[in-house]
Amino acid sequence: MVPPVIITETETAAAAKVGDSLDIVVTDPVNTKVTSSDETVVSVEQGRNDGSATFNPGGKALKSGTATLTVTNPDNTTRTIEVTVS
């Protein structure tokens, strides 16, 4: 199994290969929202708590191209991450 591409809170760009999973590190995974400018290139999954563990938001690299992920924190501040998929 290939490990996910980890995107830290200070990164504004990331590279991934088709099929890679993305793990977006945030302070508050459950209350942070992530959107993708192109869900056909990078799909996103929101952070969650399943009762036994808390998971960061993440995504999946679906096809070659570029998508901008917008991370909206609980205080409504945002940051963007440009993900290039090859």
Task: Give names to the regions the model predicted.
Residues 1-86:
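Extracytoplasmic soluble-region selector
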